[in-house]
Every structure is written in structure tokens, then in C-alpha cells.
Amino acid sequence: MNRKLSIFSAFVTFTMMIVLLMGGTVTKTDSGNGCGTDWPLCHGELIPTNPSVETMIEYSHRAVTGVVGLLIIALCLWTLVAFKDRLDIKIFAFLAFIFMLIQSIVGAGAVVWQQSDLVMALHFGISLISFASLLILTILIMERSGQEFRESVPAFLRKLLYGLLIYTLIVVYTGAFVRHVGATYACVGWPVCSQPTMTFEAWVQMIHRILAGLLFFYTLFVHYTAIRLKHRTSRTGMLFATFFISCQVATGAWIVLGGHATYVPLLHAFLITCYFGVISYLAYHAFRTRKKDSRLR
């Protein structure tokens, strides 16, 4: 294990989490136009003068994202040199970089061209994929040299994990869409909307709740399957996933029933990020143990 590289990779993964939470702050405070329609400048300036609160939030998000982007590039180059014979590490380093780049392009496009809500809802999901790639990359770097995984994931559980990963992205997209169309408080009551008439925003909110509820029960089923099949890694990972998704549902209800403070939606975003990271690793672990050779070469 390359100790210095492991520490650096873990640090970069942490900074990517910060980027995600700062992006959530931009959305929650409606600060996306805090720098006007200029990018990468802010109101035509490299450093804004007399900035408003919204400008400070948007500008700091851009600045941190730029720094983290450079850190990811440095991490990719370092891993390419340190692990010349590891295709799996190269792939996740590339994924972390490319999705960070796509996220930045989508964010810039939103400022310059005022993208639709359908497009902007992709932004958070793209960032999640970059974060998950960094997390898996860090775990791979930290593994002992020559370590093998002989505990193959049963085919049924493996397929469940693949499906859970894909379905999670769908639910994440609907959650981001709820925020971007301003539907967070469109429903009165929880878990169902109790108002007599349903607006478009209320339907968007209700559909997300239904899909999120199904994700919760899907997670419980996968956890139960991992326990029944006695697969240690999946069982432990799904225990964490179940904890995160349970807290996620609770914070979702909290937001609707009175959690108007900025930190509540940020906690909601933090929990789904942790959940997605766990599920992503478990899905990849299932993928690489499908054959005797535990690594991509």
C-alpha cells in the first residue's frame, strides 16, 4: 500500500464531499445566479467586489470546485505512475476526472445558457458518480498488494446490487428535480399529500416520495438477502446502507414537516451521498468477484 497516496486519495474524496454539499447550499439558497451570467468570472470580475451573500455562496462554490478539480487531476496522474499495472485503478481515476469535468461543464452551462430544470437535475447525480469513483479508487489504493477476494458474491445478490445502484441514480435524479422546480414544499403532509388539489409541483414531490419509499424497501430486501446468503462483505455494507437510507427517509420527512433550516437539506444530501458510495462499492465488489480473477487487468 502506498501510504502517502492513500492519504491524499482519502483527502481528495473528502473534498469532493465538500463540493457536493456546497452545491446543495447553492441550490437551497437559490444562489445559482449569484455571479450573473458570467463564467468563470463573477459579474465580469476575477474576484467580485462588494459581493452579496448569494454571490459569496456561488463564487466560493466555483473556487472550491476548481481547486478540487486540480486535486483530482493530480491524483489521477499519481495513480497512473504508482499503479501502472492496475487497470481497475486507472478506470476509476478516469471516471472520477471525467465526471468532475462533466459536472463543471453542466454547472457552467447553467450559468451561461440557463439550462432547463431537467438538465440541471443531472448535476447532482453526475457529482455523485465522481464522488463514488473517488471512494472506490481510495479503497483500491488502500488494499494490500496482491490481495484477492475469494468470497464470490452469489449471482442473485450480485444482480440485486446492480439494480439497486441503477435505481438509486433514478431516485437521486427525481430528488434533484424536486429541488430545481421548487417542489420541496409543494405537498402538505407526509408521507402523502393531503391537500385537495394537486399541482404539477405536488405531483413531482409525490412521485419522488413513492420512488424513495420503494428504494427504502429495496434496500431492506437486499440487506435481508445478504444476511440470508451469509455474504460477509455485502452484509456489512448493506447494514451501513440501511442506516443511511433510514436516516435519509427521516430527514426527507423532516424537511417537509418543518425542517426549513439550510442544514436539513444538506444533511439529506450528505446521507444520500454516503448511501450511494456504499452501494457503488458493493456493486463493484460484486462485479469483480464474479470470476476467479478478482481484478481487472
Swiss-Prot record:
Bilayer-crossing regions: 7-27, 63-83, 91-111, 122-142, 161-181, 202-222, 237-257, 263-283
Taxonomic path: Bacteria, Bacillati, Bacillota, Bacilli, Bacillales
Annotated GO CC locations: plasma membrane
InterPro entries: COX15/CtaA_fam (IPR003780), COX15/CtaA_HemeA_synthase (IPR050450), HemeA_Synthase_type1 (IPR023755)
Residue ranges that the UniProt entry lists as topological domain Cytoplasmic: 1-6, 84-90, 143-160, 223-236, 284-297
Function: Catalyzes the conversion of heme O to heme A by two successive hydroxylations of the methyl group at C8. The first hydroxylation forms heme I, the second hydroxylation results in an unstable dihydroxymethyl group, which spontaneously dehydrates, resulting in the formyl group of heme A.
A biological process from GO: heme A biosynthetic process
UniProt gene name: ctaA
Membrane-topology descriptor: Multi-pass membrane protein
Full protein name: Heme A synthase
Disulfide bond residue pairs: 35-42, 187-193
Subunit structure, as described in the record: Interacts with CtaB.
